Amino acid sequence: MSAAPHLAPGADPAMIRNFCIIAHIDHGKSTLADRMLGVTGVVEARNMRAQYLDRMDIERERGITIKAQNVRLPWRAQDGQDYILHLIDTPGHVDFSYEVSRSLAACEGAVLLVDAAQGIEAQTLANLYLAIENDLTIVPVLNKIDLPAAQPEKYAEEIAAIIGCDPGDVLRVSGKTGQGVPELLNEIVRQVPAPVGNPAGPARAMIFDSVYDIYRGVITYVRVIDGTLTTRDRCLMMSTGASHETLEVGVISPDPHPTGSLSVGEVGYVIPGVKDVRQARVGDTVTTTRNPATEMLGGYRDPLPMVYSGLYPIDGSEYPALREALDKLQLNDAALTYEPETSAALGFGFRCGFLGLLHLEIVRERLEREFNLTLISTAPNVVYRVVMEDLSEVTVTNPSDWPGGKIAEVYEPVVDAMLLLPTDFVGAVMELCQGRRGVLKGMDYLSTDRVELKYTLPLGEIIFDFFDALKSRTRGYASLDYEPAGEQLADLVKVDILLQGETVDAFSAIVHKEKAYSYGVAMTTKLRELIPRQQFEVPIQAAIGSRIIARENIRAIRKDVLAKCYGGDITRKRKLLEKQKEGKKRMKTIGRVEVPQEAFIAALSTDTGKSATSK
């Protein structure tokens, strides 16, 4: 395979087509990519396996794509010419939209893939708008036409109405059987424009992904915009100004093949001899020290964390291992941020920032699976901006940082949410959104039986169990997509949980004033069941500042001190009972309640478990 013409360096840009596939989860994107690998012959039938491009175990198990992948495909089109197609496989999930935006910037065209049995979903629409913003050519395709439940005519009209094409132009393929895939590849060659760039100018390439390899350091996946990158040049990262020796340059088809150089329009990999992934940031521009470019490629923003959660090792001695594991994960995941923090209840750990709940869950699962750590994560929360009465500002990512004293106003992040659902469920979903302090912004009927609702919702209301509630109210038919939309003034308070009069920081939460009471009652009731009974009565209280809003008591265990008395004088028994009473009284004033680790895990996991399983 290495001698194949499509792997030769220095391809003519006019013969290159760079495209990506936009689809919702489960619409068959990875399966279609598998068929393309088979049809173009880069993977022999005997080596084929399902979801060939999804390398991580978690990706295969959940059937989702997390990291963007790319592969170089040779294709002889109808005109008899040999073309080179670069497929950049993108994730479909809302949490990984920054991966999508980078992949789109590396393409000229996008295949809009829609399940012929389900129709367009919210995330497909969101990514479609992103692609249109980036001026990509859209090739509409209906997948899974072999399904008995497929309704290609109906959904072709729906797609045509949204992107403004003729329903007859919507291609019909089956990723499972391979039907229609050669026609799709021919359409990509015909419709997607060839890449343009200056082959003689200074080299400029955009990093759209990077992975960490234990033997060779950071491997960056790049799309060359201008000039040529070769192994002879030292490469220069424009955002950091650091230069490195280029160890290897090549293409992926679908396994890496060194070619020695990459020229205009080509997609491949560059291995700069870097051990620290922060030196090779995704979205950065690579140039050469010999003939450096003067300006960076635009359009990249650092991904900002939306959700914060504390990660703590259950065994305190695993703290250094957790730090090392997070360092390694950050090499692959530019959006993960973390800083050390301590908790009186949970010991040493890290406050981590994530893009959303699925991101949080996947990072946690990778830490546990790839690094053999056992972790406990605190309830997720968002970033609040608190303005004090003296006009000083405090940014709060952790409930324990909530300032005391006089607070003038609190701002919370809001999102513009787009919900797609069957018309039968509009009432139930509107009721749900209003209960979550949502404001209706608009309502569009895509067809007679599908409606798109636009809401502005506080992010803090979505990250708990909103997705679960939405799915259960619509029998699983609704889909959700959201994007940040600034912040709004909110009436928020911090609810503390007190055990025996002492605050337990791990259970504190920032909630809306109207929901503070129900949170307090739920938490105190749950802890009463989880904390073992003591020799003395333990009050569990929920408080806002110094005002108690809910209380439960853990009843004391009574030891039978009269067991050893057989008959005898009543005063003897009374003396023992009085002595026990005194002891209990003293214990109540000086006794401490030890919350067992299991109770912490159960309380926090049931609190966040509703949301963690939601996606």
Swiss-Prot record:
One of its GO terms (cellular component) is plasma membrane. It catalyses: GTP + H2O = GDP + phosphate + H(+). It is an enzyme of class 3 (hydrolase). GO terms for molecular function: GTP binding; GTPase activity; ribosome binding; translation elongation factor activity. GO terms for biological process: positive regulation of translation. GTP binds at residues 26-31, 143-146. Signal peptide: none annotated. Pfam families: EFG_C (PF00679), GTP_EFTU (PF00009), GTP_EFTU_D2 (PF03144), LepA_C (PF06421). Residues 14-196 form the tr-type G domain. InterPro entries: EF-4 (IPR006297), EFG_III/V (IPR035647), EFG_V-like (IPR000640), EFTu-like_2 (IPR004161), G_TR_CS (IPR031157), LepA_C_sf (IPR038363), LepA_CTD (IPR013842), LepA_IV (IPR035654). Its EC number is 3.6.5.n1. It is found in: Cell membrane. Keywords: Cell membrane, GTP-binding, Hydrolase, Membrane, Nucleotide-binding, Protein biosynthesis. It is a peripheral membrane protein. Belongs to the TRAFAC class translation factor GTPase superfamily. Classic translation factor GTPase family. LepA subfamily. Required for accurate and efficient protein synthesis under certain stress conditions. May act as a fidelity factor of the translation reaction, by catalyzing a one-codon backward translocation of tRNAs on improperly translocated ribosomes. Back-translocation proceeds from a post-translocation (POST) complex to a pre-translocation (PRE) complex, thus giving elongation factor G a second chance to translocate the tRNAs correctly. Binds to ribosomes in a GTP-dependent manner. This is Elongation factor 4. The lineage of its organism: Bacteria, Bacillati, Actinomycetota, Actinomycetes, Frankiales.
